[in-house]
Amino acid sequence: MTGGGSGGHITPILAVAAELKKQLPDARLVYIGQRGDRLSDIPAADPSIDAVYSVSAGKFRRYKSDGIKQIFDLKTQALNVRDLFRILAGIWQSFWLLRRLRPELIFTRGGFVSVPVAVAGRLSGIPYITHDSD
């Protein structure tokens, strides 16, 4: 299970995890969050989650209201380049983590961390489900 960055991502993950544990008590449910996420202690404390891991992630800033100005904004572009490397590192970390964990399925809920985990899962041939209740 992966997602994070806000309670809006984590809360549905925990609800799905609790229901899965009711229906499949022997299922091993693992949460993969974003490295440095201040909310990672929430899934770690939940009894439905058996283990918590973290990987690098980043985002691409694309502010439509700024138009052409954003394209030439060096700070925005520098942050995008930095986060591209974070995403690539996250895919690499996720690939090896998934190889070790050998999950049958990946459940993604959104947030920046979902991208590297889902991409690594896809490259590894692991099916994934994307949940969006918004």
Regions inferred by a protein language model and the residue ranges of each:
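Conserved nucleotide-sugar phosphate-binding/catalytic loop shared by glycosyltransferases and other
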Residues: M1-S6, K21-R86
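Residue-level detector of alpha-helix initiation sites
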Residues: G7, G111-V113
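Short amphipathic alpha-helix
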Residues: H9-K21
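Short glycine-/acidic-enriched loop or helix-start segments at secondary-structure transitions
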Residues: I10-I13, S40-P43, K64, P116-V119
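Active-site-proximal region of nucleotide-activated glycan assembly enzymes
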Residues: A27-R28, D50, L123-D134
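Short beta->alpha connector loops at strand-helix junctions that form conserved
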Residues: S54-G58, R109, T130-S133
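Conserved nucleotide-sugar donor-binding subdomain of glycosyltransferases
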Residues: T76-T108
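Glycosyltransferases and closely related glycan-assembly transferases
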Residues: Q93-I106, V115-I129
